[in-house]
């Protein structure tokens, strides 16, 4: 990832988890408060029900006592009346039977009361245990409902995270595809540059760096600005000395002007010499007798003049050829400079665009990777909490 960017500021995962834990803690506290209120209401209802049962039990006890008293007072009166009869032989047996009948109901009544008290105790214990089981059942049902709600919320969050993860994965794939396309374009540009170098080498051209455009030595040098010329033009430019291409071209143009001025001067001198020679030829017949002694000097002067004229003609022709060659080289160089400068500017623009697109893609890739890492951490945290809730639910169901 290398190049630092100004990516967006992420929300710490710890803060988000603490906010979720606080929300869950608030939900748990509210649930416990509602559960405590329900327990208090159930305890009050249970006390009222127990008092009502005790009242009903007392009424039943009083009714049963009255019934037993009525049932056993009537036989005792009949037995006392029969005991006053004059039958002496059966009186002892009847008295013994009456006493046994009076004793047996008392014992059965005490046993019934004891059994009734035991049944009441068992009933009370059963009612208390039933109330406790009812409370525990309601508590467990409430906890199960709460856990179901939490699980549903977690499942919705997980589904949302999965959707976001899928969208980010698709976005990442698109960014990778764009990176591959840009890489392919970059490879094509590199291949074009390689073919250009091969063509330059094939045609025997020479690459000359253009250090300062427009000849301004105070301007920053343009990165990647080059010029391709032939070897002859390169030799001519090397003869112009060191420096930027524009400066050397101006030097060559100045030398051209100097040569042209020299040629014009030589032409003027040649015309003057021709006029002098023609004047000398016209006066040579008249002065033949006077200048017999100076013939050798005239011949020598004519030879020197002819030699100078031939030299000047040769220099003139050579200068004209050099001027023509330089003009052709300058025009060709100007065309090549314009063409390659345009190509270099286009290449620089494409390179800048590719670099900007690459930096943008790298920033987006880092952002996407950070989001994916954050979602993976959130997913693992939620998965752990979900497993913990499932374990608690399983334990509660096992206890139930």
Swiss-Prot record:
Residues 29-71, 106-202, 245-393 form a coiled coil. The keyword Coiled coil applies. The modification Phosphothreonine is found at residue 99. Residues 1-28, 53-119 are annotated as: Disordered. Pfam families: LRRFIP. Residues 73-102 have a biased composition (Polar residues). It comes from the Eukaryota. GO terms for biological process: regulation of DNA-templated transcription; Wnt signaling pathway. InterPro entries: LRRFIP1/2. Keywords: Coiled coil, Phosphoprotein, Wnt signaling pathway. The modification Phosphoserine is found at residues 18, 77, 80, 88, 92, 96, 100-101. Residues 53-68 have a biased composition (Basic and acidic residues). May function as activator of the canonical Wnt signaling pathway, in association with DVL3, upstream of CTNNB1/beta-catenin. Positively regulates Toll-like receptor (TLR) signaling in response to agonist probably by competing with the negative FLII regulator for MYD88-binding. Belongs to the LRRFIP family. Interacts with DVL3 and FLII. Weakly interacts with MYD88 in resting cells. Following LPS-stimulation, the interaction with MYD88 is rapidly enhanced; the complex gradually dissociates to basal levels after 6 hours of stimulation. Interaction with MYD88 is regulated by LPS-induced phosphorylation. In the presence of LPS, competes with FLII for MYD88-binding. This is Leucine-rich repeat flightless-interacting protein 2. It comes from Bos taurus.
């Amino acid at each position: 990832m290398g190049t630092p960017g100004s990516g967006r500021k992420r929300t710490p995962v710890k803060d988000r988890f603490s906010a979720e834990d606080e929300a869950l803690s608030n939900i748990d506290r509210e649930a416990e408060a509602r559960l405590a209120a329900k327990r208090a209401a159930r305890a009050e209802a249970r006390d009222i029900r127990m008092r009502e049962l005790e009242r009903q039990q007392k009424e039943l006890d009083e009714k049963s006592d009255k019934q037993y008293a009525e049932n056993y007072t009537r036989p005792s009166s009949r037995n006392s009346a029969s005991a006053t009869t004059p039958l002496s032989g059966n009186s002892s047996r009847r008295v013994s039977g009456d006493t046994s009948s009076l004793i047996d109901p008392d014992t059965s009544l005490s046993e019934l009361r004891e059994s009734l008290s035991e049944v009441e105790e068992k009933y009370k214990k059963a009612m208390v245990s039933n109330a406790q089981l009812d409370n525990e059942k309601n508590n467990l049902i409430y906890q199960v409902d709460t856990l179901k709600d939490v699980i549903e919320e977690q499942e919705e969050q997980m589904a949302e995270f999965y959707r976001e993860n899928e969208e980010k994965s698709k976005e990442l794939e698109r960014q990778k595809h764009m990176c591959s396309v840009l890489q392919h374009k970059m490879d094509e540009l590199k291949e074009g540059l390689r073919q250009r170098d091969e063509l330059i080498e094939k045609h025997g051209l020479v690459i000359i760096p253009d250090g300062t455009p427009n000849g301004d030595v105070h301007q920053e040098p343009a990165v990647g600005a080059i010029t391709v010329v032939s070897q002859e033009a390169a030799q001519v430019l090397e003869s112009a000395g060191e420096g930027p291409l524009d400066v050397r071209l101006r030097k060559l143009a100045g030398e051209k002007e100097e040569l042209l001025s020299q040629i014009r001067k030589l032409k003027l001198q040649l015309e003057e010499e021709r006029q002098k020679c023609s004047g000398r030829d016209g006066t040579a017949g008249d002065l033949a007798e006077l200048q017999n002694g100076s013939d050798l000097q005239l011949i020598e002067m004519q030879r020197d003049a002819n030699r100078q004229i031939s030299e000047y003609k040769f220099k003139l022709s050579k200068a004209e050829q050099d001027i023509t060659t330089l003009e052709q080289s300058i025009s060709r160089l100007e065309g090549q400079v314009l063409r390659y400068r345009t190509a270099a500017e286009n290449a620089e623009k494409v390179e800048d665009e590719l670099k900007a697109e690459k930096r943008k893609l790298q920033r987006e890739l880092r952002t996407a990777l950070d989001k994916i890492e954050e979602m993976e951490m959130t997913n693992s945290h939620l998965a752990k909490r979900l497993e913990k809730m499932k374990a608690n639910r399983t334990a509660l169901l096992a206890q139930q």
